[in-house]
From Swiss-Prot:
Compartments reported by the entry: Cell inner membrane
Function according to Swiss-Prot or TrEMBL: NDH-1 shuttles electrons from NADH, via FMN and iron-sulfur (Fe-S) centers, to quinones in the respiratory chain. The immediate electron acceptor for the enzyme in this species is believed to be ubiquinone. Couples the redox reaction to proton translocation (for every two electrons transferred, four hydrogen ions are translocated across the cytoplasmic membrane), and thus conserves the redox energy in a proton gradient.
One GO term describing the cellular component: plasma membrane
Protein name: NADH-quinone oxidoreductase subunit N
Membrane-spanning ranges: 20-40, 59-79, 83-103, 115-135, 137-157, 172-192, 220-240, 251-271, 285-305, 314-334, 342-362, 394-414, 431-451, 481-501
Naturally occurring in which organism (per UniProt): Desulfovibrio desulfuricans (strain ATCC 27774 / DSM 6949 / MB)
EC number from the UniProt entry: 7.1.1.-
InterPro entries per record: NADH-Q_OxRdtase_suN/2 (IPR010096), ND/Mrp_TM (IPR001750)
Coiled coil: none
Length: 505
């Protein structure tokens, strides 16, 4: 009688699949605890910061400890615990942890409510992990919205700054439009295949195309265009980039750092899954389309960055350009290209978060911009004039990040671009690679322009005062140390990064 009542765990498929959701469950518990902690202990700001970082670290450890051989699925295939999900999920979780560590100083300076801030960031990362692991179109879309909605609120969280509210409105309107395009494209694919499972979509579409159905190919091409447009907005590729400069500049600096890395990485993972696993029959079309988008994105991002006087806005256009570089790996339509994209986004995590950490350090050390009274210290390029004389160590750290963003050896940025260029070249996109090399040369002008201000120009009278040592901010110190190590060591010893990437692909 007991045997018929108490079923073994293997007979309970929902419970048996829960371990695949372990990182997501940790993030969910962390977000809920942050909300409750802010309700009962609103003054424990440092605790909220370290709780967020700890939750991200535990979720990251669980992700790294999972066995992804064979591409396991859960909950009937709607959730995939495979290598693609793990590699990109690691970057999103690391971005959450690093952003949390450097947020307390900025939130204190900007007088932002930290309980909502950290919980929204945790919920957004939860959405990223869900969409990265989605094996079903419906789950993918739900994860995307769970990622986007908290970011809309995060962008507007600095209520005293009118730029923040303006950026949030722009981002919400453009994001809603892009989500509608993506949903429309997925609905067309569902109409063609009768399936929401991404892998099954590919099988049904292959059958329809093999029998020369005259209606299938045109409809599939339209769906492909809508999916590229919807996800192109999330990645900030040309011509879907128009929101990025204003939103990146107007959002709180920590939010800009988070969304420029984590949201971009999750969107690239979804783009890779939908194209490689859902639409492989259309690869001749979408690979050429991605190569064309990459060229436009690299050119516009780098050329527009030349004219900027705000470092945050310059980094916004730089993020657009880096999205173009990352597209080269997907355009290659090969396992090597996907590995190169994952490796590059991992490196981009270190060099971009590190650059924003320097901006936040200058902001925290200055009273300028407090309570939304104009731009924060560190946002304008002229704030970096004479930084080497005022804070030699901080200037040296920033110089490493600038070299890595440019792609100058022996930094990790060089190795990341080399892997992408090699994959694209092997796939037959030689001219595209030449354009990418030219664009990297253009980027040296504005990146090294910051270095020129730091080392070859005198400080302004109103330049933010900084000490000669990076002291007083434990979280920022940790972020700068981790990002500096990644930007340097992965350039000198790229085998360590390649070994980790090869484990998943």
């Amino acid at each position: 009688m007991t045997d018929t009542v108490i079923a073994p765990l293997s007979a309970l498929p929902l419970l048996a699949d829960l371990p695949a959701l372990a990182p997501e469950l940790v993030l969910l518990v962390t977000a809920v605890c942050l909300m409750l902690g802010d309700l009962f202990y609103p003054r424990e700001r440092v605790f909220q910061q370290w709780l967020t970082a700890a939750g991200a670290a535990v979720a990251l450890a669980l992700t790294l400890s999972m066995n992804f051989s064979g591409g396991a699925t859960a909950f009937g295939g709607v959730f995939r615990a495979d290598g693609l999900a793990a590699a990109f999920k690691v970057v999103c979780l690391a971005a959450l942890g690093l952003t949390a560590l450097m947020s307390e100083a900025f939130c204190r300076h900007a007088s932002m409510r930290q309980g909502e801030y950290y919980s929204l960031m945790a919920f957004s990362t939860l959405g990223m992990c869900v969409m990265v692991s989605a094996g079903d179109a419906i789950v993918l879309y739900l994860g995307l919205e769970l990622m986007a909605l908290p970011i809309y609120a995060l962008v507007a969280l600095r209520t005293a700054d009118p730029r923040s509210s303006e950026a949030a409105i722009k981002y919400f309107l453009m994001g809603s439009f892009a989500s509608a395009l993506l949903l429309f494209g997925l609905s067309i694919l569902y109409g063609l295949t009768g399936q929401t499972d991404i892998a099954e979509m590919a099988h049904r579409l292959a059958v329809s195309l093999s029998v020369s159905d005259m209606h299938t190919l045109p409809a599939a091409v339209v769906a492909l265009g809508l999916v590229l447009a919807g996800l192109g907005f999330k990645v900030a590729t040309v011509p879907f980039h128009v929101w990025a400069p204003d939103v990146y500049e107007g959002a709180p600096t920590t939010v800009t750092a988070f969304m420029s890395v984590a949201a971009k990485t999750a969107s690239f993972a979804v783009l890779g899954r939908v194209l490689l696993q859902g639409l492989p029959q259309l690869s001749p079309l979408w690979s050429d389309a991605l190569a064309g988008l990459a060229v436009l994105t690299m050119l516009l991002g780098n050329i527009a960055a030349l004219a900027q006087t705000s470092l945050k806005r310059m980094l916004a256009y730089s993020a657009i350009a880096h999205a173009g570089y990352a597209l080269l790996g997907l355009a290659a339509c090969t396992p090597e290209g996907l590995r190169a994209t994952a490796a590059y986004l991992t490196i981009y995590l270190c060099m971009n978060i590190g650059a924003f950490a320097v901006i936040i350090y200058l902001s925290a050390r200055s009273g300028r911009g407090r309570m939304g009274e104009g731009p924060d210290a560190g946002e304008d390029l002229d704030d970096y004039r004479g930084l080497a004389a005022r804070s030699p160590l901080l200037a040296a750290v920033m110089l490493v990040f600038l070299f890595s963003l440019t792609g100058i050896p022996p930094t990790a940025g060089f190795m990341g671009k080399f892997m992408l260029f090699r994959a694209a070249f092997a796939a037959g996109y030689q001219i595209t690679v030449v354009v990418a090399v030219v664009c990297s040369t253009i980027s040296a002008w504005y990146y090294l322009g910051v270095a020129k201000r730091m080392y070859m120009q005198d400080s302004q009278d109103d330049a933010p005062a900084t000490s000669c040592a990076i002291t007083g901010e434990t979280g920022l110190q940790a972020v700068l140390a981790v990002c500096l190590a990644g930007a340097v060591l992965w350039g000198i010893f790229p085998q360590s990064l390649l070994f980790w990437i090869n484990v998943y692909f």
